[in-house]
């Protein structure tokens, strides 16, 4: 196994291309995949009628990471943290759905490698409270109120 950061951009790009191809094979013909930047991908899956269908899709996406990615002599073992937002429960426009999926993804990352989270409204409240607390702490440090 290797740390991807030790190999530079060219190898990182090859790993991302391989992951993109695996994800493309994991989704249905009517689904859409896009790289958002860095190592983040978005998958738009239309016409999922029930949670069971969503779970089946998540399992297929996670399976894309089961086998190591081999580039040259290096082998990379990767995992995915998946955030899920559902239309119309979690938003009615692309911006809101993507933001909420991103929030859920960060919760999945906190839970550990290879996990997923459905978006729930409490996640946004938690994120807002945390950002407010961090801002308050920064201000306290700047004013010399903490030792």
Model-inferred region functions:
Residues 1-28, 34-43, 49-59, 99-102, ...:
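Conserved long alpha-helical elements within nucleotide-processing catalytic cores of c-di-GMP signaling
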Residues 25-30, 62-75:
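Short catalytic/binding micro-motifs of nucleotide second-messenger systems
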Residues 38, 81, 113:
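ATP/adenylate-binding site constellation spanning eukaryotic-like Ser/Thr protein kinases
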Residues 44-54, 72-75, 80-97, 122-126:
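Catalytic strand-loop-helix junctions within cyclic-nucleotide turnover domains
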Residues 59, 72, 87-113:
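Catalytic-core segments of nucleotide cyclases and related cyclic-nucleotide turnover enzymes
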Residues 119:
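Conserved beta3-strand ATP-binding lysine motif
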Residues 129-147:
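Active-site core of bacterial EAL-family cyclic-dinucleotide phosphodiesterase domains
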